[in-house]
């Protein structure tokens, strides 16, 4: 009988097998869904987990060259767009530049009390795609960490380190985990560490697939977001509430992604 690592439940836990699909690597992996909090958990984490993150193929490690070396004029235009969408500096130019499809992160950042000089950490950032996009839009104090990148990256005032979350000592005004929390073992210890890395009255953003979703109910073990064995936990809203309370966070907002049926949770540590 499997015991849930989130709520401790042992009753009515459903066990099932999932295959690795992204790279068609050999192997099947045993998961279970907690009958109480509905968190989906990988039972045995492979000792060679890094082999399932091939640096030349894994999507988050592929960085477009135009994100690293943007033109100064283009950056100035993008900053006008950021002023309009994030910081509500309304003007005609910002309005025109914001017509049409814009990057989703504008909707996340306008919810938190930050500015262009705020210290921002992206945990599990891969090659830094999002950080370089933010740099193009005017943000100046950007840090990322990822244990699976080949080496540190220092380009255009964006600093990305090959390290684990428990190796970080600095504190930050805002921390993001964009589809990385589901890759991390010991989720409660991770949240407690993140709590300690935030400055007072700061915010943590976690974007994850959630188990209490239409896609899990509809596709079952064929749901792409299971992503065995890279996803160690597929949390539910209930499991995230349990963890956040134990770590000392207060949940300020929960947003369900319409396109991917994924969840976004915004926490504050004070």
Residue locations for each model-derived region?
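Hydrophobic/aromatic residues located in beta-strands of well-ordered beta-sheets
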Residues: 142, 204-206
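Short N-terminal helix/helix-N-cap motif within the alpha/beta-hydrolase-1
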Residues: 185-189, 216
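Conserved catalytic loop of SAM-dependent methyltransferase domains
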Residues: 18-24, 252-270
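Conserved N-terminal segment of class I S-adenosyl-L-methionine
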Residues: 1-178, 188-191, 256
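A short glycine-rich, Lys/Arg-flanked "PGG" loop and its adjoining helix->strand segment in the class I
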Residues: 188-203
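A short His-aromatic
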Residues: 179-183
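Feature marks short, surface-exposed loop/turn motifs that line or immediately flank catalytic pockets
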Residues: 151, 211-214, 258-260
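Short, glycine-/aromatic-enriched active-site segment of Class I SAM-dependent methyltransferases
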Residues: 206-233, 238-243
């Amino acid at each position: 009988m499997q015991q849930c690592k989130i709520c401790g439940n042992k009753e009515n836990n459903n066990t099932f097998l999932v295959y690795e699909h992204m790279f068609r690597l050999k192997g099947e992996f045993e998961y279970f869904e907690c009958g109480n909090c509905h968190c989906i958990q990988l039972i045995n984490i492979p000792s060679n987990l890094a082999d399932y993150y091939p640096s030349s193929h894994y999507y988050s490690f592929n960085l477009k060259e135009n994100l690293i070396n943007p033109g100064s004029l283009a950056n100035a235009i993008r900053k006008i767009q950021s002023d309009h969408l994030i910081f509500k500096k309304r003007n005609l130019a910002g309005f025109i530049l914001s017509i049409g499809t814009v990057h989703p992160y504008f909707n996340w950042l306008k919810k938190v009390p930050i500015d262009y000089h705020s210290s921002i950490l992206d945990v599990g950032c891969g090659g830094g795609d999002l950080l370089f996009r933010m740099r193009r839009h005017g943000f100046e104090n950007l840090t990322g960490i990822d244990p699976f990148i080949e080496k540190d990256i220092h380009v255009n005032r964006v600093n990305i380190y090959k390290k684990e979350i428990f190796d970080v000592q600095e504190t930050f005004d805002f921390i993001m985990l964009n589809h990385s929390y589901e890759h991390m073992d010991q989720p409660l210890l991770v949240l407690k560490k993140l709590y300690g890395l935030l400055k007072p009255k700061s915010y943590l953003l976690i974007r994850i697939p959630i188990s209490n979703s239409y896609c899990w109910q509809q596709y079952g073990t064929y749901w792409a977001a299971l992503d065995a064995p890279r996803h160690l936990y597929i949390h539910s809203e209930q499991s995230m509430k349990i963890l956040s309370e134990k770590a000392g966070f207060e949940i300020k907002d929960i947003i369900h992604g319409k396109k991917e049926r994924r969840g976004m949770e915004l926490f504050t540590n004070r």
